[in-house]
Swiss-Prot record:
It is an enzyme of class 3 (hydrolase). SUPFAM superfamilies: 5' to 3' exonuclease, C-terminal subdomain (SSF47807), PIN domain-like (SSF88723). This is Flap endonuclease 1. It comes from Aeropyrum pernix (strain ATCC 700893 / DSM 11879 / JCM 9820 / NBRC 100138 / K1). The keyword Hydrolase applies. NCBIfam families: fen_arch. Its cofactor is Mg(2+). The gene is fen.
């Protein structure tokens, strides 16, 4: 779920763009975040995910395949970063997510029995699960498509932020804001699904475009440092301290941090209750120094079309004609947008 910084981000630090504005940039994408979005959004009207003849879920593969092609056709260079072992501090959040999914599954079944299609779809989306088999097959598909991916030792967003700080990527891509706390110079949101999107439970659509958020303009406008932003995030609540510190919203958290200045003083001021200040200091240190790796190579290779056909058509019953048309697009995008092309290094703002 991540930290919610949306209310604090000033207009000066964010802007909506068309996909083509990101052409030439390497983007380190939070793979789990993207795959969950595909599993949630790519469903039939009753909420059922896409399935092959054996009943295996394929929504994630469909989203990954076609969306990646859309990105590279625009000249974007996606690098998918996969989560490793979650830190022990995240166990409470993981357990809570499992509980919520189990509850959503039960409500989904009741809605189906009652013939409530809209309710069934809503709860089916909430119950989406990403299994280890899905993750491994996603990596296999990316290999076949010639797309690079990186295995993070722990949090994918931390690894993606590290790659962006090093200059190996221009920005991180995720719906969550955590990568800003991890120090990513830029965050791009709304990459998995763009265009018109129906609001859940309402007969209303909104236009979704990619959104760029830059860390330095954000910090400058708020008048704080990255370390202080981490303290704000902890007060609001992160995956490592769900719910945050009682009584603090975005404005009150920012006010306290600016008043006390030193993040250690901020965390020490928290009343001993649900979260001990010593524990919160560990969370703070994790955002500053998460486990990351330099064991990766960003290389875009010629697609192995036969392997893609094997995975999608032979194994998972994808429509062969549609896959062939997509492979033609992928091959053309590789030749014209990826092969031998240098990445853009210029800054977006400024």
């Amino acid at each position: 779920m991540g930290v919610n910084l949306r209310e604090l981000i000033p207009p000066e630090a964010r802007r909506e763009v068309e996909l083509r504005a990101l052409s030439g940039y390497v983007l380190a994408l939070d793979a789990y975040n993207m795959l969950y979005q595909f599993l949630t959004a790519i469903r039939q009207p009753d909420g059922t995910p896409l399935l092959d003849r054996e009943g295996r879920v394929t929504s994630h593969l469909s989203g990954l395949f076609y969306r990646t092609i859309n990105l590279v056709e625009e000249g974007i260079k996606p690098v998918y970063v996969f989560d490793g072992k979650p830190p022990e501090m995240k166990s409470r959040e993981v357990e809570e997510r499992l509980r919520r999914k189990a509850e959503a599954e039960a409500r989904y079944r009741r809605a189906v029995e009652a013939g409530e299609v809209e309710e069934a779809r809503k709860y089916a989306m909430m119950a989406a699960r990403l299994t280890s088999d899905m993750v491994e097959e996603s990596k296999e598909l990316l290999d076949a498509m010639g797309m690079p991916w990186v295995q993070a030792p722990a949090e994918g967003e931390a690894q993606a932020a590290y790659m962006a700080r090093k200059g190996d990527a221009w920005a991180t891509g995720s719906q969550d804001y955590d990568s800003l706390l991890f120090g990513s110079p830029r965050l791009v949101r709304n990459l998995a699904i763009t265009g018109r999107r129906k609001l859940p439970g309402r007969d209303q659509y909104v236009e979704i475009k990619p959104e760029i958020i830059e860390l330095e303009p954000l910090l400058s406008k708020l008048g704080i440092t990255r370390e202080q932003l981490i303290a704000v995030g902890i007060l609001l609540g992160t995956d490592y301290n769900p719910g945050g510190v009682r009584g603090y919203g975005p404005k009150t958290a920012l006010r306290l941090v600016k008043s006390l200045g030193d993040p250690m003083k901020v965390l020490a001021s928290v009343p001993r209750g649900e979260y001990d200040p010593d524990y919160l200091r560990k969370v703070y240190e994790y955002f500053l120094n998460p486990p990351v790796t330099d064991d990766y190579k960003i290389e875009f290779r010629k697609p192995d079309q036969d392997k893609v056909r094997e995975i999608l058509v032979e194994r998972h019953d994808f429509n062969p004609e549609r896959v062939e048309r997509a492979l033609e697009r992928l091959g053309k995008a590789y030749r014209e947008k990826l092969r031998g092309r240098q990445s853009r290094l210029d800054m977006w703002f400024g």
